[in-house]
Regions:
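Expand to "…catalyze enediolate/carbanion chemistry for C-C bond making/breaking, isomerization
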Residues: 1-250
């Protein structure tokens, strides 16, 4: 959206050329955001990606309204033997209604992103937490069903870091695994919110270890009944912590 129509051709060439150079193996994923697959610019973007021998490791797809869009893109990438991962932005009423199908339609998908700005415009509501709570919840439910990440919309006020932090805390509590940013100075705060604390990590280790030793469907830890479905989240926490430690991302 930030590229003027007359500049999209040049931007496309420069973006594709960037990935001709081997990217650093630093644990940070480089994602190329393309145009909507239902627009000519988006089709041109996909064509350029299919024609290159060094595609981006991941693509961000905006304004996705149906699983058919992603299934077609997946097929084209597979035909070219491109291993691009996909990050899907849900920001329309149609996309929200089909979020479950979209999230589960391709093994390439790593995350659903909530596009709150466009969504609020479609819903004719304020771009605030309460009016968009239902839409956010749908994104989390769809992502969870597919076992992928749910990423909340960026906080647009760069001069209100505390407001961003509080919104990020709410998003985490709702089930989001991260939050987008529009400026590097927002990243440390978001990392602070979404990085598992040492206390959370130790609890996850204790729960997983206890279950593995007990070989049963439920255990009692510190007087609380913990059932087996909780294990998935505990293993996710440990996987996140391990990746952060391995790549020194904080």
């Amino acid at each position: 959206d930030g590229i003027a129509p007359q500049d999209k051709g040049l931007a496309r060439k420069l973006a594709i050329k960037l990935f001709e150079t081997k990217q650093n193996d630093d644990g940070i994923e480089r994602i190329l955001r393309i145009n909507s697959l239902r627009e000519k610019f988006g089709i041109d973007d996909v064509q350029a990606i299919l024609n290159t021998k060094t595609p981006p490791p991941a693509l961000m797809i905006p304004k996705v309204k149906s699983s058919e869009e992603i299934v077609l893109l997946d097929s084209l990438l597979t035909e070219k033997r491109h291993n691009c991962r996909l990050h899907i932005i849900i920001e329309t009423n149609e996309g929200l209604e089909k979020a479950y199908d979209i999230a589960n339609c391709s093994n390439r998908i790593d995350a659903l992103f909530f596009g709150g700005v466009d969504m609020s415009a479609e819903l004719r509501c304020e771009n605030k937490w309460e009016p968009l709570l239902y839409a956010r919840s749908r994104i989390v439910h769809a992502a969870s069903s597919a076992g992928i990440d749910a990423i909340d919309v960026p906080f647009l006020d760069l001069d209100d870091p505390e407001g961003m932090k509080q919104e990020a805390i709410k998003a985490k509590g709702l089930g989001f695994s991260g939050k987008g940013s529009i400026h590097p100075k927002q990243i440390p705060i978001l990392n602070e919110v979404f990085t598992p604390s040492e206390e959370v990590i130790q609890r996850a280790k204790k729960i997983t270890s206890t279950f593995e030793k007990a070989n049963t469907g439920l255990v009692v830890i510190e007087g609380k009944l913990i059932e087996k479905p909780v294990l998935r989240e505990m293993y996710r926490i440990l996987a996140v912590a391990k990746k952060i430690e391995k790549n020194n991302l904080i």
